[in-house]
Curated annotation (Swiss-Prot):
HAMAP family: HisC_aminotrans_2
GO-annotated biological processes: L-histidine biosynthetic process
Catalyses which reaction(s): L-histidinol phosphate + 2-oxoglutarate = 3-(imidazol-4-yl)-2-oxopropyl phosphate + L-glutamate
N6-(pyridoxal phosphate)lysine: residues bearing it: 211
Protein name: Histidinol-phosphate aminotransferase
Keyword check for 4Fe-4S: no
Subunit structure: Homodimer.
Pathway(s) served: Amino-acid biosynthesis; L-histidine biosynthesis; L-histidine from 5-phospho-alpha-D-ribose 1-diphosphate: step 7/9
UniProt source species: Aeromonas hydrophila subsp. hydrophila (strain ATCC 7966 / DSM 30187 / BCRC 13018 / CCUG 14551 / JCM 1027 / KCTC 2358 / NCIMB 9240 / NCTC 8049)
NCBIfam families from the UniProt entry: hisC
């Protein structure tokens, strides 16, 4: 007998999430994971490493609450926003009974976390204008416990319409929790829906330090919600989820100086993004450039496979989304520093016209 037969059926059937790092391949220009292009120095004090860390480090909780404009009892720190997604499913969904709703094409971990927990998935694709289908979602509220929305959406870069979200939250009162993933919100902070937490106890917002804060390597995320939701999640989270060095780095990132550096990075990356989009508009191989509210641009090419192969041959690693619904020939490009973006454009300019 194979030892695999002892695993849960759902795990045996599970296809693991194909993270950018897992499927990236080999290259010297990495623009496939929406990471920041450069790392920044932090200091770590080792005098407390012999002790278990705080479950919820106060300096991090208070720092993020002040940054996000909420109360500390509305914040839960986790091992990345991915753990926040899983905690929400484990807390509010009964395995084998309940379902979540997602709007593909969108971030893959919502579905993976649900599958791992034995929770069903209802798919309600985005509309042709790449917005959630609000009436269709409202019709399914009796069937689901959690609705996951990503704003800006990964991979399309679109923002969730605020009016549609408010109407959905009204209809979902006492019926379902609506989760808005704001992993990329620092690149368009004016579009945050955190202010709606005061009106809707069934709204949850997830955040991360991985993108604009340039800290993907430390895996630190946040859940912003009503104190009641946070208290429920705190029952389920591991006893010591945030290692002491991670808490120290996160606290430094959330200090006034850390926030100022983050905002400077955002300004620079948004400039790079605008210049990159302007250059794309001049190229014969580009068919469509999607919305650009994150630190990435999704591009539909005339021949996406040829572009992806040419980039790979040049050692440039991008993320292919051509198999996702409505995204044929589409490739996502993370915004890096200028030299990296110039390298991408050089490959695109060298593509022979007859190929398209």
């Amino acid at each position: 007998m194979s030892i695999a037969n002892l695993a849960r059926r759902v795990v045996r059937a599970l296809t693991p999430y194909q993270s950018a790092r897992r499927i990236g391949g080999k290259g010297h220009v990495w623009l496939n994971a929406n990471e920041a292009p450069l790392a920044y120095p932090f200091t770590i004090e080792g005098g407390r490493l012999n002790r278990y860390p705080e479950c919820q480090p106060a300096e991090v909780v208070n720092g993020y609450a002040a940054y996000a404009g909420v109360n500390p009892d509305q914040v839960l720190v986790s091992r990345g926003a991915d753990e926040a997604i899983e905690l929400l499913i484990r807390t509010f969904c009964e395995a084998g009974e309940d379902q979540i709703l997602i709007c593909p094409p969108t971030y893959g971990m919502y579905a993976i976390s649900a599958e791992t927990c034995g929770v069903g998935i209802v798919e309600q694709p985005l509309t042709t204008s790449r917005q959630p289908d609000w009436p269709a979602i409202a019709d399914r509220l009796s069937d689901v416990k959690l609705v996951f929305l990503c704003s800006p959406n990964n991979p399309t870069g679109d923002l969730v319409g605020r009016d549609g979200l408010i109407a959905l939250l009204e209809k979902a009162r006492d019926r379902a929790i609506v989760v808005v993933d704001e992993a990329y919100i620092e690149f368009c902070p004016e579009a945050s829906v955190v202010d709606l937490l005061a009106r809707f106890p069934n709204l949850v917002v997830t955040r991360t330090l991985s993108k604009a804060f340039a800290l993907a390597g430390i895996r630190c995320g946040f859940t912003l919600a009503s104190p009641e939701v946070i208290a429920m999640l705190a029952k389920v989270i591991a006893p010591y989820p945030i290692p002491e060095p991670i808490a120290q780095i996160a606290a430094q990132a959330l200090s006034p100086m850390g926030l100022e550096l983050m905002q400077e990075r955002v300004v620079e990356l948004n400039k790079q993004k605008a210049a990159f989009k302007a250059a794309l508009a001049t190229l014969h191989c580009v068919k469509e450039v999607f919305e650009d509210k994150g630190n990435f641009v999704l591009v539909r090419f005339v021949d996406g496979a040829a572009v992806f192969a040419a980039m790979k041959a040049a050692g440039i690693i991008l993320r292919d989304f051509s198999t996702k619904p409505g995204l044929d020939n589409s490739i996502r490009v993370t915004i890096g520093y200028q030299g990296e973006m110039d390298a991408v454009l050089a490959v695109l300019r060298d593509l022979p016209s007859p190929s398209f």
